[in-house]
Amino acid sequence: MSEVLDNGQSRILVADDDPAILRLVKAIVEKEGYTVITARDGKEAYKVLQSGEPFAAAIFDVVMPYIQGTELVRYMQSEKRLMRIPVIMMTAEQNSRLSSDSFAAGAVAFLPKPFTNAQLQTMLRMFIRQS
């Protein structure tokens, strides 16, 4: 599937502090043919983003230790090399403000937990093709 990308990127950064969700998302994304780089919290994700490695997309939990997902998106929007990377936000929190905050920060999609494999696969296909 990575051949749909203009720049050949096939890596996706996934950050979530719940190990079970991290494993699930990694498995779904790998099934789509991507290489997954995982981060267990916002600080780890921030370090990965600073490394300069290219990514086709990012998937962040909204609520994480150290640095929230929305703060990561704001950081990405402030960096020229990161601002075009589509970010999908996800959360189990039942708070409509979190979705509006995610979109205001620059996320392209918001995925409430629990979600189905098909929902995440559809979002990946939709937003990576557009990037």
In which residue ranges do the predicted regions lie?
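A Lys-centered signature of the CheY-like receiver
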Residues: 113
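Short, glycine/charged-rich "phosphate-handling" switch motifs in NTP-dependent
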Residues: 108
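Acidic, metal-coordinating helix/loop segments flanking the phosphotransfer/catalytic sites
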Residues: 38-57
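Charged docking surfaces used in two-component/phosphorelay signaling
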Residues: 23-31
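The feature encodes the CheY-like receiver
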Residues: 22, 65-66, 83, 95
